[in-house]
């Protein structure tokens, strides 16, 4: 995972001091790209321990089209608690836009089902896109989408995915995002009869919060270890049929967790 360490180092050396919505302060760079060959191992950061359960359940929650944290709580995941209202609702966030994008005539578009169908029918299409950035709904969301658009690409029987992330908390959020979209790429590849190719992660404002600087410096003193492998249950052929038990991670030997506070 040298790609991630290179990004941390770039921000620490070249980042501009910027004010931000949370009032915490950041070091920020604009425009960066990382590439991960999914055939070389599952890109789960090894220089600190990450909670795979939370990553998997959050992705399954998105794919359900869910926007209430009850499902997450039922599975011991609390990463969205700070933004939910008293009823656990978040407004029309990721899951809603992915699965039920509203149309002017009162209908809804299931972008996930549509893109999978298009990959099967026309894999050379340049329109294999899902977006969560809906300007009409942004003000209704508890948190506007940070990872806001992704595109699939098929060549030589392999499926690749590129994510555009407008805003990225490099210490806490980005390791989650890498693993989540790598896993989504593997899932979509399986249900479309393809092999996983690359995950390409492109950023707009990628930043290190001022209260994460020492943690990032600590992480950079640790040597990355071999990537683990992720295996999916080969019997699952429907993207919406995956369950937590269908994922098996092997060979994950990370350095210890590094505690840091989330900026809300």
UniProtKB/Swiss-Prot annotation:
User: Where mainly located?
Assistant: cytoplasm
Tell me the Pfam families matching this sequence. Answer: Thymidylat_synt
What general EC class does the enzyme of this chain belong to? transferase
Question: What SUPFAM superfamilies does the annotation carry?
Answer: Thymidylate synthase/dCMP hydroxymethylase (SSF55831)
Binding residues for dUMP, per the UniProt record?
21, 126-127, 166-169, 177, 207-209
Provide the active-site residues from the annotation. Answer: 146
In which residues is (6R)-5,10-methylene-5,6,7,8-tetrahydrofolate bound?
169, 263
Annotated GO MF terms: thymidylate synthase activity
Q: Which reaction does it catalyse?
A: dUMP + (6R)-5,10-methylene-5,6,7,8-tetrahydrofolate = 7,8-dihydrofolate + dTMP
Quote the CDD domains the UniProt record gives: TS_Pyrimidine_HMase
What UniProt keywords are attached to this protein's entry?
Answer: Cytoplasm, Methyltransferase, Nucleotide biosynthesis, Transferase
Q: Where in the cell is it found?
A: Cytoplasm
Which terms does the UniProt entry file under GO BP? dTMP biosynthetic process; dTTP biosynthetic process; methylation
| GO terms under cellular component | cytosol
Q: What is its EC number?
A: 2.1.1.45
Pathway as given in its UniProt record: Pyrimidine metabolism; dTTP biosynthesis
Q: How does it assemble?
A: Homodimer.
What job does this protein perform?
Catalyzes the reductive methylation of 2'-deoxyuridine-5'-monophosphate (dUMP) to 2'-deoxythymidine-5'-monophosphate (dTMP) while utilizing 5,10-methylenetetrahydrofolate (mTHF) as the methyl donor and reductant in the reaction, yielding dihydrofolate (DHF) as a by-product. This enzymatic reaction provides an intracellular de novo source of dTMP, an essential precursor for DNA biosynthesis.
Q: Which family does it belong to?
A: Belongs to the thymidylate synthase family. Bacterial-type ThyA subfamily.
HAMAP family according to UniProt: Thymidy_synth_bact
**Could you identify this protein by its name?**
Thymidylate synthase
Please name the source species.
Bradyrhizobium sp. (strain BTAi1 / ATCC BAA-1182)
Organism lineage: Bacteria, Pseudomonadati, Pseudomonadota, Alphaproteobacteria, Hyphomicrobiales
Q: Tell me the name of the encoding gene.
A: thyA
């Amino acid at each position: 995972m040298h790609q991630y360490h290179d990004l941390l180092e770039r921000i620490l050396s070249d980042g501009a001091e910027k004010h931000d919505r949370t009032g915490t302060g950041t070091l920020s760079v604009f425009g960066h790209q990382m590439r991960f060959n999914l055939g070389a191992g599952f890109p789960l950061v090894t220089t600190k321990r990450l909670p795979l359960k939370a990553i998997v359940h959050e992705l399954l929650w998105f794919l359900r089209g869910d926007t209430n944290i009850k499902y997450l709580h039922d599975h011991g995941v609390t990463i969205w608690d700070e933004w939910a209202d008293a009823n656990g609702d978040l407004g029309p966030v990721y899951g809603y836009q992915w699965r039920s994008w509203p149309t002017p005539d009162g209908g809804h578009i299931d972008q996930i089902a549509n893109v999978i169908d298009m990959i099967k029918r026309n894999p050379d299409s340049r329109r294999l896109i899902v977006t969560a950035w809906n300007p009409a709904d942004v003000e209704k969301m508890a948190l506007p989408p940070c990872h806001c658009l992704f595109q699939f690409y098929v060549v030589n029987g392999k499926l690749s995915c590129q994510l555009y992330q407008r805003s990225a908390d490099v210490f806490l959020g980005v390791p989650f995002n890498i693993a989540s979209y790598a896993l989504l790429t593997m899932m979509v590849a399986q249900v479309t009869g393809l092999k996983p190719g690359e995950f390409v992660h492109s950023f707009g404002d990628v930043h290190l919060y001022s209260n994460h600087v020492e943690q990032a410096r600590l992480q950079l003193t640790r040597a990355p270890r071999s990537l683990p492998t992720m295996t999916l249950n080969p019997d699952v052929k429907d993207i919406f049929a995956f369950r937590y038990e269908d994922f098996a991670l092997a060979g994950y030997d990370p350095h210890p967790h590094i505690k840091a506070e989330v900026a809300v």
